[in-house]
A protein has these predicted regions:
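A short secondary-structure junction signal
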Residues: 141, 146-149, 157-158, 175-181, ...
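Short, structured patches in soluble enzyme cores that scaffold and shape functional sites
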Residues: 133, 149-151, 167-171, 183
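Non-heme Fe(II)-dependent double-stranded beta-helix
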Residues: 2-42, 48-147, 153, 194, ...
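Short, P/G- and charge-enriched loop/turn segments at secondary-structure junctions
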Residues: 150-155, 216-218
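Non-heme Fe(II)/2-oxoglutarate
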Residues: 2-24, 66-69, 73-74, 78, ...
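Conserved hydrophobic/aromatic beta-strand scaffold that supports enzyme active sites
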Residues: 28, 44-46, 164-168, 218-220, ...
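Short, conserved beta-strand element in jelly-roll/cupin
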Residues: 155-174, 222-223, 230, 254-258
Length: 296
């Protein structure tokens, strides 16, 4: 079976989203000043409407298809873990690279609602793609995602101008393992890197006394299906297990401001050509998604 690598297409390839044709259309997707201020103070922003019910259902169909371990396109994933949990009694599906495989998970990168918000939260700058992720916690036995900072896994790129968008494909609640945040923790600097699917609170050992006090008061970011949460790459976050009777599925889009460079002479993602240390991140696998000056 011949497989088309959708990373070669830098733009919408389906009718799932419509690209704005005017400045007014783009402005209709803008976050408020209050929302941007909240993000800058707390390091995250939750409850941003990102997908319609129709878009959610189409993306769920894509996810069901590619989650099959026997699917012929698995060679295009950067990483594929049908169960990444370190606890044998729980399951955490985690994969990177779905944008290369299905129309829906490709086109979410060019969702204008996402792009406008991402540009604003990065400082009204052009937005470049880093990579995507899928997280799936099945009912009753969905595993945890340990408290961590995203950038602790991304030190092979610099400077720190990265942003994460986490989008719910199911209602995300305390019961099914919603994201939790420590407000203001993006100002703590870079902490050691934990095992992502290991002990939930393993990061506690690396916190000072003041940080431990704040760590004891996490904010649960419960969101509805189709809503997104944005967070800074240094914001401390994690999620508990899914003890509910329903799945908790989500996709993640990781981006950075245009101009971020490689800080490694090793491959930045599995199967992707090396971007030499010191060179700008760009090309087939790291496309420019949105430039506010050109689009608006």
């Amino acid at each position: 079976m011949e497989v088309m690598d959708l990373s070669k297409v830098h733009g919408l390839i389906s009718e799932l989203f419509q690209w704005p044709v005017s400045k007014a259309e783009w402005e209709s997707y803008m976050l408020t000043k209050e929302q941007v201020s909240f993000f800058n103070e707390n390091g995250y922003l939750a409850g941003i409407k990102m997908l319609t019910d129709r878009q959610v259902e189409m993306i769920k169909k894509d996810l069901e298809e590619i989650a099959n371990v026997n699917h012929p396109v698995h060679s295009l994933f950067y990483e594929f873990n049908s169960n990444e949990s370190t606890d044998p009694s729980t399951i955490l599906f985690h994969a990177l690279g779905a944008w290369r495989i299905t129309n829906g998970l490709h086109d979410v990168l060019w969702n204008p609602r996402f792009l406008m918000a991402a540009s604003q939260l990065l400082g009204n700058v052009p937005v470049r793609f880093w990579h995507d992720q899928i997280f799936w916690k099945p009912p009753k036995q969905g595993g945890v995602v340990a408290w961590h900072q995203d950038y602790s896994y991304w030190t092979r790129t610099k400077p720190i101008k990265h942003l994460t968008c986490w989008c719910a494909l199911d209602d995300s609640t305390k019961e099914n393992g919603c994201l939790q945040y420590i407000p203001g923790s993006q100002k703590w600097g870079l902490l050691p890197k934990p095992v992502i699917a290991g002990e939930l609170e393993g990061i506690r050992d690396f916190l000072n006394d003041d940080q431990k006090k704040k760590f004891g008061h996490p904010q649960f970011a419960e969101v509805k299906v189709g809503e997104a949460i944005f967070h800074h790459s240094l914001t401390l976050h994690g999620s508990g297990s899914n003890t509910s009777s329903k799945p908790r599925r989500a996709f993640v889009i990781n981006v950075f401001a245009d101009g971020v460079i490689s800080d490694s002479d090793e491959p930045l993602l599995n199967g992707v050509p090396v971007v030499p240390k010191g060179e700008k991140m760009k090309g087939q696998f790291f496309p420019l998604l949105f430039d506010p000056e050109e689009s608006m």
